[in-house]
């Protein structure tokens, strides 16, 4: 089409990264914040928690490994559930409900695992399932950018955000543990609140639904219905 042709010609005259940063700032910011949520869920809950359980509550390494394996398996199911929910109900509802569940389950996990060690596998499995809300992150990112800059937009937003937050999260949580041993719980709670806010923002912006087909006129989740 004429619109596609003109867009492609304009894109060819400038760097794709420049086009993404200049023309799609909102999409970049939202994608980077969602990647931060993803990194918090994976790095803190899945990767750091086994060692935290050993130091904070004195669990044996073999026990935390088993619990972590259960959480990882449940994470896979959670990601599938989040994807299905995003297709069925939209990204906004998925992040609103998923973030609330993540906040509640992570708070319970970090605070009850020590006093109820017999419930460790259940608590870790449930929070692992709820971390699966991050499975809806790619759903939003794919629809955040128009086709002509989609690959560049996703790769730029994801890689820059994960390099920053994925790298700084372990350091930040470790430093915060000097203030409170429950730093992982507070960190995940804070990011869950951010996910909740983004969910409402997506709802206000028009949401992301599968029936909104790819267009060349702009990022589809910023198009009001």
Q: Positions of the model-derived regions?
A:
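Short, small-residue-biased leader/transition segments that mark boundaries at the very start
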Residues: 2-5
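Extracytoplasmic gate region of multi-pass secondary transporters
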Residues: 25-75, 165-169
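Helix-to-loop junctions at the C-terminal end of transmembrane segments
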Residues: 79-90
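Cytoplasmic membrane-interface "Motif A"-like loop-to-helix N-cap segments
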Residues: 88-99
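C-terminal ends and interior cores of transmembrane alpha-helices
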Residues: 100-114
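Hydrophobic core of transmembrane alpha-helices in multi-pass small-molecule transporters
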Residues: 118-135
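Multi-pass alpha-helical transporter architecture, strongest
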Residues: 140, 186, 190-218, 223
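A late C-terminal transmembrane helix in Major Facilitator Superfamily
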Residues: 148-177
């Amino acid at each position: 089409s004429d619109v596609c042709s003109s867009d492609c010609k304009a894109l060819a005259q400038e760097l794709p990264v420049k086009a993404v940063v200049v023309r799609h700032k909102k999409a970049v910011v939202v994608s980077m914040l969602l990647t931060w949520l993803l990194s918090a869920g994976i790095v803190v809950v899945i990767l750091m928690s086994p060692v935290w359980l050993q130091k904070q509550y004195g669990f044996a390494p073999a026990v935390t490994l088993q619990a972590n394996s259960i959480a990882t398996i449940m994470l896979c199911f959670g990601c599938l559930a989040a994807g299905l929910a995003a297709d069925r109900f939209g990204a906004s509802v998925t992040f609103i409900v998923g973030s609330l569940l993540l906040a509640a389950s992570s708070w319970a996990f970090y605070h009850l695992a020590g006093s109820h060690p017999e419930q460790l596998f259940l608590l870790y499995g449930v929070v692992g399932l709820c971390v699966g809300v991050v499975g809806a992150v790619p759903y939003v990112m794919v629809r955040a950018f128009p086709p002509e800059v989609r690959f560049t937009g996703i790769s730029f937003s994801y890689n820059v955000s994960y390099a920053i937050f994925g790298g700084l999260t372990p350091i930040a949580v470790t430093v915060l543990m000097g203030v409170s041993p429950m730093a992982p719980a507070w960190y995940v709670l804070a990011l869950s609140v951010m996910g909740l806010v983004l969910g409402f923002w997506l709802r206000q912006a028009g949401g992301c639904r599968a029936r909104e087909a790819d267009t060349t006129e702009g990022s589809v989740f910023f198009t009001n219905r």
